[in-house]
């Protein structure tokens, strides 16, 4: 199991949001400095979200993210505003290890297969953002049916992995809800990475025992509620 420190980028800065709300942003400085700090503390992978992309500017921060990939040299998964095959291709060609396809995957699931056949399924991750058991899309503003049903469909279409985010608890640092995670893992055979609510060693141990492939650490890491050292120790 891997721990992915989050590097969420908005306006060229590393930020953390609460519940995905732009107005809740707390600024943590230069994204590359944040990324470098996590690597120095033992991270071997990063979860990079282009929030400007999620808020409508698809190629915002491209040069910065390319630099981050080049300078860090570690595994990077990237999401945020990938709304077309052209967007996906542009980001894959920056050298990120995999891209996270969210709303686009629910609108055009066949895109997952198209991209997987071109770049390999391992580089295509489908985002399963769930609210009240439903998949949440369009910046979590709309829901479109049972999240497990969508997850199995994404796997059938060619996604090589899934990013499960529990929108109900994301950014609140209140702990993970394991039941939906376990339900999802039972339904699919591809790796599942979990985001949302991960805020203690116990959360990470629970996820590890449930069989997840990775966990994203965001708000709890930046606020100091958990250290990266504690997180890495919890999954040994």
From Swiss-Prot:
Taxonomic lineage from the root: Archaea, Methanobacteriati, Methanobacteriota, Stenosarchaea group, Methanomicrobia
One Pfam family linked to the record: His_biosynth
Entry keyword annotation includes Transmembrane: no
Protein name, as recorded: 1-(5-phosphoribosyl)-5-[(5-phosphoribosylamino)methylideneamino] imidazole-4-carboxamide isomerase
HAMAP family: HisA
Superkingdom of the organism of origin: Archaea
Gene this protein is translated from: hisA
GO cellular component: a single term: cytoplasm
Metabolic or biological pathway, per its Swiss-Prot or TrEMBL entry: Amino-acid biosynthesis; L-histidine biosynthesis; L-histidine from 5-phospho-alpha-D-ribose 1-diphosphate: step 4/9
């Amino acid at each position: 199991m891997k721990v992915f420190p989050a590097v969420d980028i908005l306006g060229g800065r590393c930020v953390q949001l609460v519940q995905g709300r732009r107005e809740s942003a707390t600024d943590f400085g230069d994204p590359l400095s944040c990324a470098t700090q996590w690597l120095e503390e033992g991270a071997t992978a990063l979860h990079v979200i282009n929030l400007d992309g999620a808020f409508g500017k698809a190629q915002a921060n491209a040069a910065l993210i390319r630099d981050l990939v080049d300078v860090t040299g570690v595994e990077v998964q990237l999401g945020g505003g990938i709304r077309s095959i052209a967007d996906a291709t542009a980001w894959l060609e920056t050298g990120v290890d995999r891209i996270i396809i969210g709303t686009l995957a629910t609108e055009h699931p066949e895109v997952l297969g198209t991209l997987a056949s071109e770049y390999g399924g391992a580089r295509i991750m489908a985002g399963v953002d769930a609210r009240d058991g439903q998949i949440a899309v369009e910046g979590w503003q709309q829901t479109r049916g049972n999240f497990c049903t969508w997850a199995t469909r994404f796997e059938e279409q060619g996604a090589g992995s899934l990013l499960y985010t529990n929108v109900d608890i994301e950014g609140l640092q209140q702990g993970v809800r394991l039941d939906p995670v376990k339900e999802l893992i039972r339904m699919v055979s591809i790796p599942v990475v979990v985001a949302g609510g991960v805020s203690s060693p116990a959360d990470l141990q629970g996820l590890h025992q449930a069989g997840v492939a990775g966990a994203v650490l965001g708000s709890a890491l930046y606020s100091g509620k958990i250290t990266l050292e504690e997180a890495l120790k919890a999954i040994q």
